[in-house]
Regions:
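A broadly conserved sequence feature marking short terminus-proximal activation segments
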Residues: 1-37, 106, 146-147
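Short metal-coordination and nucleic-acid-contact micro-motifs, chiefly zinc-binding Cys/His arrays
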Residues: 35-38, 52, 69-71
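Cys/His-enriched microdomains
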Residues: 40-43, 54, 124
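Cys/His-coordinated zinc-binding microdomains
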Residues: 46, 60
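Short functional micro-motifs and their immediate structural scaffolds
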Residues: 50, 63-65
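Conserved hydrophobic positions within beta-strands
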Residues: 73-76, 115
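OB-fold (S1/OB) nucleic-acid-binding surfaces
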Residues: 91-109
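Well-ordered alpha/beta subsegment
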Residues: 106, 111-151
Length: 151
């Protein structure tokens, strides 16, 4: 058992200030402490879904649990923010990329974050990405990196 599994709910909320941690998503934040991206999967129909919900939106089963995903996929949508709410580690002096990635685990399974280690000109729809991690305010957050940056 890891430290992430032993952490109390109150301590979990303190590790991720400003995040809305609930009964339905606490396992996902514990996974982040292990640098593991967890998304809900239904035990009855096998479908993945995000964001976390207590009931499968496909078959209405309550047999859902947080399971790890690899985090490989393609950029489905990309925008550059020039302004936004204050957030640890976010610098709006240069446009800040926000992407929605369609994950390889299932068609239509999407996760939104940012891309790190790439020029904004290289962040484009259809680009292949892999899961990476960044530390923000002392807590790990899932981000994406381009698999093959443009030459």
């Amino acid at each position: 058992m890891s430290v992430a599994d032993d952490i109390s709910d109150d301590a979990l909320v303190q590790r991720f200030p400003g995040e809305a941690i609930t009964h339905d998503n606490a396992a996902h934040y514990r996974g982040r402490l292990r640098r593991e991206l967890l998304l809900n999967r239904c035990a009855d129909c096998g479908r993945w879904h995000a964001p976390p919900k207590p009931i499968c939106p496909d078959c209405w089963s309550s047999a859902v649990s947080a399971e790890p995903v690899r985090g490989d996929g393609v950029i489905f949508m990309a925008i550059l923010l020039h302004r936004g709410p204050p957030a640890p580690g976010v610098d709006y002096s240069t446009p800040y990329p926000v992407v929605t990635v369609e994950l390889d685990e299932q068609s239509g399974l999407r996760f939104t974050s940012t891309v790190v280690g790439a020029d904004n000109d290289d962040i484009r729809i259809g680009a292949a990405v892999r899961l990476d991690w960044a530390d923000r305010a002392g807590a790990p957050i899932p981000v994406f990196a381009l698999k093959e940056p443009r030459a």
